[in-house]
């Protein structure tokens, strides 16, 4: 469901935003890919996915507060 919402928002943005703002288009393409990969994971893999993503973005070892048992 989340994937469909992101795709719909991306389509609206592609229509409204001119092509010279290519970074906005690229951002939504990356978001579609991330949401697609996230929805394919199970509960424990989702925890590790966000832990790895946040530590990669920040450059530090980030512990997510959600402990999925």
Curated annotation (Swiss-Prot):
Query: Where does the protein principally reside?
Result: host cell
Domain of life, source organism: Viruses
Keyword Transmembrane helix listed: yes
Q: Where in the cell is it found?
A: Host membrane
What GO cellular component entries does it have?
host cell membrane; membrane
UniProt entry tagged with the keyword Transmembrane helix: yes
Q: Which residues lie on this side of the membrane: Extracellular?
A: 37-69
Q: Could you list this entry's UniProt keywords, alphabetically sorted.
A: Glycoprotein, Host membrane, Membrane, Transmembrane, Transmembrane helix
Looking at the UniProt entry, the stretches that span the membrane are: 16-36
Q: How does it sit in the membrane?
A: Single-pass membrane protein
Where are the annotated glycans? 51
**Residue intervals annotated with topology Cytoplasmic:** 1-15
Cystine crosslinks: none
Similarity comment: family membership: Belongs to the asfivirus X69R family.
Which protein, by its recorded name, is this? Uncharacterized membrane protein X69R
Source lineage: Viruses, Varidnaviria, Bamfordvirae, Nucleocytoviricota, Pokkesviricetes
């Amino acid at each position: 469901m989340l994937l469909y919402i992101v795709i719909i928002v991306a389509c609206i943005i592609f229509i409204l935003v001119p092509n010279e703002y290519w970074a906005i288009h690229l951002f939504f393409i990356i978001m579609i890919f991330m949401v697609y990969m996230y929805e394919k994971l199970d509960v424990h893999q989702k925890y590790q996915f966000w832990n790895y993503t946040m530590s990669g973005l920040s450059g530090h070892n980030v512990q997510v507060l959600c402990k999925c048992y």
